[in-house]
Structure formats: structure tokens, C-alpha cells
Design a protein with these regions (language model features):
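A glycine-rich phosphate-binding loop feature that marks nucleotide/adenosyl-phosphate handling sites
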Residues: 200-203, 231-237, 287-288, 304-312, ...
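A short, Trp-centered hydrophobic/proline-enriched beta-strand micro-motif
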Residues: 29-36, 88-90, 194-196, 224-230
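Short, solvent-exposed aromatic-acidic interface loops
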Residues: 127-135, 258-263, 399-402
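A residue-level signal for conserved active-site and pocket-lining positions in enzyme catalytic cores
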Residues: 91, 117, 191, 246, ...
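Conserved hydrophobic core element of enzyme catalytic domains
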Residues: 318-428
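An anion-binding catalytic pocket shared by soluble metabolic enzymes
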Residues: 43-50, 84, 103-106, 115, ...
Length: 428
């Protein structure tokens, strides 16, 4: 992969209110989709006006550049005179560098759309973007007018990048899973690890279009962030994640710990299970401790609550912080990624264990996905997700291993987590 080293040019933007159907057609290929119904937010990004990619060593500098406060010149007046669009940079950060199976997805990639359509606070807006050096008010106004005409007059959907369907799943072997769990427990008993999150894959033959899958997920999981990132060549990375990595506005940060899982019918039992409470406490302590190094203040509730989803329940603790004046998104990502909810405790030892023994090309799974813009970001941990390409949807399923875990119970937990996408595939 070639890393972009050129400075990121300032952007020019133009926005307006709009109307039309929820999923309009005629706007070109949909490159990114983001829906969080609980917050009333829905985003669709079309085309690319600008893209930047980086290797792991360039992540901090890239995030700092994307989130700088003066990154956009609005040609229709001051930014505070209108609702600000999410982002507008959209993209993802891989858990580990994607290999051949992830062709079309760079390890770190963010892009500005040519056209952004978003619903929020009960209203719809549209914005167009271009590098400032290439933009004029007339050219952006023409693009904006054309987009508004398409929004007003066309119906249908534009998320038909790759087909998916439910069928008999091809899964990683249970014997290999059991061996990996046993090895993890050996390292835990030797005190090398306290927790490690191991993952496996499930392959499902392709069938219905991705748009139907996304629409089912956002209806079934309004508390989650349903996402779609189009890869080069038409591959798709889709999911509906329950875990926010960060919501950043200026220096105010909101994040969360999500660890400990059960069937919805057993949700309240999570508050009485020592194994799940212990696992959750380690995640909370790690996140809060990492944030204290870059924050003026960190607020953590005294005890967790339960978050119930349609197919699974989790222990949940919201965490908020006010960053030091010199800290921003780059420092937050450096401090928290990967969290113990997807790596383990201690973090470095857990990630090393996974690299040596998991033998799974995680790619974007368990990485970060979302939107970045001037002095703000909305990023989630990419969970409950699948890579869709070549007629196959590969689902990624993980479970946290701690003292007291068993291979059988953790396998069943991953089966439980698979239901979100499998049910959506069947409904689609």
C-alpha cells in the first residue's frame, strides 16, 4: 500500500435542506452508510472528492489532519449558521493490516464524499464537497442543485454493491476453537494474560442485496450503529455494532465499556455473575486509566447497567472525559485502540497472543469505523459485521476468554452473536 504523504488540502463545502425518499437512487455509487436510529442519525455518502490512506505509523498524523478545526470553508456562510454535517471524512482503521482476502480495503482509509446526505433532528440535509483549490461557488451550487433534483424526484435504493443470502454456514472447526480457548486459559493461569478476545469466522453464500440487509439491521437494532463501507472493486464491509469507540465534540469525549454477554432472557443475571462482572471491570479500568493520561477529568459510574439488544444482552458502562487542551482524536485513538473489549488485558500481551495463535485475518473486524470532521468524530468498534465479496459473506465472531471460561460456552456465545447478521440475511 502506498501511504499518502501530501498535505491534506482545505475543503470547500456547500449545503442545503432537502427532501425525498429515505434511500434515493440516481446519485451514484453509495460509498458509505451509517445509521444510528436511537440518535435519529442517518448518513449516506456518494462518490469521493478526496481520499487519504496511511500505514499504522501514519495514523496519528492523519487523524490530526482530518480533525483540524479549520479544515472546511463553507461557501454559504459561517459553519455555525447551519446544521453541521457528520464527518465529512468517512472510513475505517483496521485491527490488523488486511491481507489478500481484504482486497479493496486499505488498513487505514478515509475519504470525503462528493455528496453527503444526512437525516438528523427530523430534517434532511445535503452537502457537496471539493478541494478548495478546485472549487467555485458556481460549480458546487450546480452539483448541489443536481443532487436536490435527484433527491426530490427519484425513488429506490443505491446500496446494491454486493449480494448476500442465508444458507448453510461454513464455520471454523470447533476442535480448533477448543484448542485456542485452552491455550488462552493456560496463558491466563500463568498470569501472562487476564483476558483475551479470540475470534472465528463463519462463511455464508451470497444472495439478496446489501440494501435489504442494512434496512433490516437498522430496524432490528436501533441502539446500534449500522454501517456499510464500499471497498474498491465493489466488495462491502457491513455490520451493526453495539459498541461506540468515541463520540468527540471539541474536547468533550464520550465512550463506553461493553463486555459480558448473555441471552436477553438472562440479561439481569449479568449483574450477579462474577465472571462477567470481573471481565467488564477490567475493560472499564483500562479505558478510564488510559483516558486519565490525556484528560482533565474522567467520569465513570460506580456500577454497570445492562444493555439489551434483540439477540444478546451486555454489561454496559458509559464513560465521559474532558480532554487536555493539547489532546484530540489522535491521542484518543492512540490511548484506547484496540480496547480490551476486542483485544484483551494486558492489551499488548493480548494482541501479541492473537497475532501468534488466532490465525484469523481480522482486517477491519474489531477495528474502527465512522466519521471524522473539524474538532469532532463519531467512531465505533466494528463488531457484528461481515465482509461481502465474491459471492460470500464472511461473518466475524468473537468472545472474551477469562478464568472460568469454557470452549463450549464461548462457542455458544459466538453463535448467539452471529444471530444478528444471520437473522438479517434470512429476512433480506
Amino acid at each position: 500500500m502506498t501511504q499518502d504523504t501530501a498535505p491534506i488540502p482545505r475543503l470547500a463545502g456547500l449545503s442545503a435542506e432537502a427532501s425525498g425518499p429515505p434511500d434515493p437512487s440516481g446519485l451514484g455509487p453509495l460509498c458509505f452508510f451509517w445509521s444510528h436510529p436511537e440518535r435519529g442519525l442517518r448518513v449516506r455518502a456518494y462518490g469521493e472528492a478526496l481520499r487519504r490512506e496511511a500505514g499504522a505509523g501514519g495514523l496519528g498524523a492523519l487523524l490530526s489532519a482530518l480533525s483540524r478545526a479549520d479544515g472546511i470553508t463553507w461557501l454559504d456562510g459561517p459553519a455555525d449558521a447551519r446544521p453541521r454535517p457528520p464527518g465529512p471524512w468517512f472510513g475505517a482503521v483496521a485491527f490488523d493490516p488486511p491481507r489478500a482476502a481484504w482486497s479493496g480495503f486499505a488498513p487505514i482509509r478515509f475519504a470525503v464524499p462528493r455528496l453527503l446526505v444526512w437525516d438528523g433532528a427530523g430534517r434532511r440535509h445535503v452537502a457537496v464537497f471539493a478541494p478548495e483549490k478546485d472549487a467555485t461557488r458556481a460549480s458546487l451550487q450546480s452539483a448541489l442543485d443536481e443532487a436536490r433534483r435527484s433527491l426530490d424526484g427519484r425513488f429506490g435504493d443505491t446500496i446494491r454493491n454486493s449480494p448476500v443470502a442465508r444458507a448453510a454456514a461454513v464455520q471454523d472447526g470447533r476442535a480448533r476453537w477448543a484448542g485456542l480457548v485452552d491455550l488462552a486459559l493456560e496463558r491466563i493461569r500463568s498470569s501472562e494474560l487476564r483476558k483475551v478476545v479470540i475470534a472465528r469466522a463463519m462463511d455464508v453464500p451470497a444472495g439478496p442485496p446489501v440494501d435489504a440487509l442494512l434496512q433490516h439491521l437498522e430496524r432490528a437494532y436501533p441502539q446500534c450503529r449500522t454501517f456499510h463501507l464500499r471497498g474498491d472493486g465493489g466488495a462491502a464491509f457491513v455490520g451493526s455494532t453495539p459498541e461506540s469507540f468515541c463520540s468527540l465534540e471539541g474536547r468533550q469525549l464520550h465512550t463506553e465499556a461493553l463486555a459480558g454477554s448473555a441471552l436477553p432472557a438472562e440479561a439481569q443475571e449479568l449483574l450477579r455473575r462474577p465472571k462477567d462482572l470481573r471481565e467488564h471491570e477490567w475493560v472499564v479500568d483500562h479505558i478510564a486509566g488510559a483516558l486519565r493520561d490525556i484528560s482533565e477529568s474522567v467520569e465513570v459510574p460506580a456500577s454497570p447497567a445492562v444493555r439489551e439488544l434483540a439477540t444478546v444482552a451486555h454489561l454496559h458502562t458509559p464513560i465521559s472525559a474532558r480532554l487536555h487542551s493539547g489532546a484530540g482524536l489522535a491521542e484518543v485513538v492512540a490511548a484506547l485502540h484496540p480496547t480490551p473489549a476486542v483485544g484483551g488485558v494486558p492489551s499488548a500481551a493480548a494482541v501479541r497472543f492473537l497475532g501468534e495463535h488466532e490465525k484469523l485475518d481480522r482486517g477491519l473486524y474489531a477495528g474502527l469505523i465512522g466519521l471524522v470532521g473539524p474538532s469532532r468524530a463519531e467512531l465505533a468498534v466494528a463488531l457484528r459485521c461481515a465482509r461481502i465479496a465474491g459471492g460470500t459473506a464472511r461473518l466475524f465472531l468473537g468472545a472474551g476468554i477469562v478464568e472460568g471460561s469454557s470452549a463450549e460456552s464461548e462457542w455458544m456465545e459466538t453463535q448467539l452473536k452471529a444471530r444478528a447478521l444471520l437473522d438479517a440475511l434470512e429476512a433480506a
